[in-house]
């Protein structure tokens, strides 16, 4: 086998490989003979079909298969010999064939050489937060509101009330599509409606008819309504006030607490809040570390890896539509290219961090991650056992653990400053509620 390597552009490489022609001819001949022994063709006894007949019928297909196998096998031998690391499947182009040799070309991309830079320039503001008694009480208050019952009242509507109404919206005196409703139910303070709508309901009683003036936001989804001034003629039919459950052992029982009553509920709430806080703190720091790593390291990315990631993201997006992908048009690659490229770059950079620091997934960390995730379920032991018995899930958790270890390794050289933050403020930002 003779091999020549050509760097065409960027990460693309072109291998020209020559193998003795007799290698292919022998393989074709052997394959034809095997086929002749097992072929069943009318007019010939089993196992007695002449090779010439087999060659006439199947020779072209057999030669094509053999050629493909020879190209694949010799390609693998060539990249090993040349110490090349393909980032995707090669494209084979069969070339000339004569009595002496068979020549073909393999084109593919290689992984980039990654040299980590600027690790000591990564800046991280590490948030420090804890769950206080006041945070637990605030969560209990939220749970009370979620389990509130509502009853009609004969007073002015206030924040937190539920109201029922009929309304008709108009712009420049003309009703618009989607601007009319009957028996519409709304909780005041929920922020469901456009700015000014809920505020216009406050202070009115059931049975009143009134008009409120609002402006549609510039970013409103309907093009014909963006930034437009509108009027809503409203008939308020009912005002309902919330009746919150008392915070006692009966309240705790609503959440499956059979022993320990209210104190047991508070303990469980604190545990869940601590788990969510720990996850959010880790995610916040990781996001900053990754951002710094990306900013300080510009590397060329193999198109093959980006294309593969685009396909993954596209499939995930299709599944979010309910899995009904059969009759859906394929989503354009452009929708996912930027995100795919970012994920590929992160993977390559973190891979180099793992390699440089000789990191291996720590079993204790893997089991800790599984236990933390399982604690959110009714029977954690069942979830833990399931993960430990599933090779694919365990590999996923090892990857998560390795990523954590890589981030921790980067933190050692980063410029880290700590900042005390309140639980509610931090979690609101983390969940996008701020």
From Swiss-Prot:
Keywords: Cell cycle, Cell division, Chaperone, Cytoplasm, Isomerase, Rotamase. This is Trigger factor. One of its GO terms (cellular component) is cytoplasm. Belongs to the FKBP-type PPIase family. Tig subfamily. It is found in: Cytoplasm. Residues 160-245 form the PPIase FKBP-type domain. Its EC number is 5.2.1.8. Pfam families: FKBP_C (PF00254), Trigger_C (PF05698), Trigger_N (PF05697). The keyword Isomerase applies. It is an enzyme of class 5 (isomerase). The keyword Cytoplasm applies. The gene is tig. PROSITE patterns: FKBP_PPIASE (PS50059). One of its GO terms (biological process) is protein transport. It catalyses: [protein]-peptidylproline (omega=180) = [protein]-peptidylproline (omega=0). It comes from the Bacteria. Consists of 3 domains; the N-terminus binds the ribosome, the middle domain has PPIase activity, while the C-terminus has intrinsic chaperone activity on its own. Involved in protein export. Acts as a chaperone by maintaining the newly synthesized protein in an open conformation. Functions as a peptidyl-prolyl cis-trans isomerase. It comes from Shewanella sp. (strain W3-18-1). GO terms for molecular function: peptidyl-prolyl cis-trans isomerase activity; protein folding chaperone; ribosome binding.
């Amino acid at each position: 086998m003779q091999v020549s390597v050509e760097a065409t552009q960027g990460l693309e490489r072109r291998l020209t490989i020559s193998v003795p022609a007799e290698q292919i001819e022998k393989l074709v001949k052997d394959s034809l003979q095997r086929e002749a022994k097992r072929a069943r063709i009318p007019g010939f006894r089993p196992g007695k079909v002449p090779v010439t007949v087999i060659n006439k019928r199947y020779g072209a297909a057999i030669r094509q298969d053999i050629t493909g196998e020879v190209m694949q096998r010799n390609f693998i031998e060539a990249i090993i010999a040349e110490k090349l690391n393909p980032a995707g499947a090669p494209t084979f182009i069969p070339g000339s064939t004569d009595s002496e040799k068979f020549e073909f070309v393999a084109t593919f991309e290689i992984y980039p050489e990654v040299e980590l830079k600027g690790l000591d320039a990564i800046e991280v503001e590490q948030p420090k937060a804890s769950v206080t008694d006041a945070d637990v009480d605030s969560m209990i208050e939220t749970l009370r509101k979620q389990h509130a019952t509502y009853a009609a009242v004969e007073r002015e509507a206030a924040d937190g009330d539920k109201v029922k109404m009929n309304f008709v919206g108009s712009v420049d005196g003309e009703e618009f599509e989607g601007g009319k409703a009957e028996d519409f139910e709304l909780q005041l303070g929920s922020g469901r409606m456009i700015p000014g709508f809920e505020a216009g309901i406050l202070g009115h009683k059931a049975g009143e008819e009134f008009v409120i003036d609002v402006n549609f936001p510039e970013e409103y989804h309907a093009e014909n309504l963006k930034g437009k001034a509108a009027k809503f003629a409203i008939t308020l039919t009912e005002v309902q006030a919330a009746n919150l459950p008392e915070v006692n052992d009966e309240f705790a029982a609503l959440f499956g607490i059979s022993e320990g009553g209210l104190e047991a509920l508070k303990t469980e709430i604190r545990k869940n809040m601590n788990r969510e806080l720990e996850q959010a703190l880790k995610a916040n720091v990781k996001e900053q570390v990754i951002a710094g790593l990306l900013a300080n390291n510009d590397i060329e990315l193999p198109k093959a890896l980006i294309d593969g990631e685009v396909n993954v993201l596209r499939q995930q997006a299709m599944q979010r539509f309910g899995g009904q992908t059969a009759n859906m048009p394929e989503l354009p690659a452009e929708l996912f290219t930027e995100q795919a490229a970012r994920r590929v770059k992160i993977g390559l950079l973190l891979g180099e961090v793992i390699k440089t620091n000789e990191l291996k997934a720590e079993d204790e960390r893997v089991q800790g991650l599984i236990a933390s995730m399982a604690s959110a379920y009714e029977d954690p032991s069942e979830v833990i056992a399931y993960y430990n018995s599933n090779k694919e899930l365990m590999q996923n958790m090892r990857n998560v653990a390795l990523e954590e270890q890589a981030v921790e390794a980067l933190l050692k050289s980063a410029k880290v400053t700590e900042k005390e933050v309140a639980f509610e403020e931090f979690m609101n930002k983390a969940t996008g509620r701020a």
